[in-house]
């Protein structure tokens, strides 16, 4: 019944809360994640947790990604898997089309040759498209993504794992949305004081 040595004394039976890609896209709000071939349950759980913490409304698991309800993924998500719209859609093309219909742009990370993530506007609704830990995004999926960014690094580190890079982008999106909202609020207060 459990895969841990000292489980909690609780048991439950529940149905999976999968939602169709179109419904997930509609629930995405300002931020969604599309995981393509992300196979490590720890990374996937980290991405679910970071997505929720940064205001994402949906995480779409596509093209061979780990089962979001795998025990290690659920634990790593700290329950976020139950609080965001989760889709096991299977097809990244369908997921991207649904997100585009819902008004979200698409953005992926690459190792080099793109602008730094902090130089790109992430305040508008965006879907972060994240690929396999070892191989990145498949070419057909990468070709459908509108923009790419890189995360500058120093030292000898070759790359970050997908959980870390996705988390950085989630919180950069949140930072930019907050900054935009604060500027808008400040502008509204100034307008209210004008005769």
Label every model-predicted segment.
Residues 12, 52-54, 68-70, 75-81, ...:
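Structured adenosyl-cofactor binding patch, chiefly the S-adenosyl-L-methionine
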Residues 107-157, 161:
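Active-site/ligand-binding-proximal alpha/beta "capping" segment
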Residues 9, 30-31, 125:
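Conserved catalytic motifs of the protein kinase core domain
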Residues 13-113:
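RNA substrate-binding interface of SAM-dependent RNA methyltransferases
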Residues 1-14:
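Glycine/small-residue-rich loop that forms an oxyanion/phosphate-binding "nest" at active or ligand-binding sites
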Residues 1, 95-98, 158-163:
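Short, charged, surface-exposed secondary-structure boundary motifs
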Residues 1-4, 22-26, 78, 98, ...:
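Short secondary-structure boundary/capping segments
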Residues 44, 126, 166-170:
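Alpha-helical structural signal
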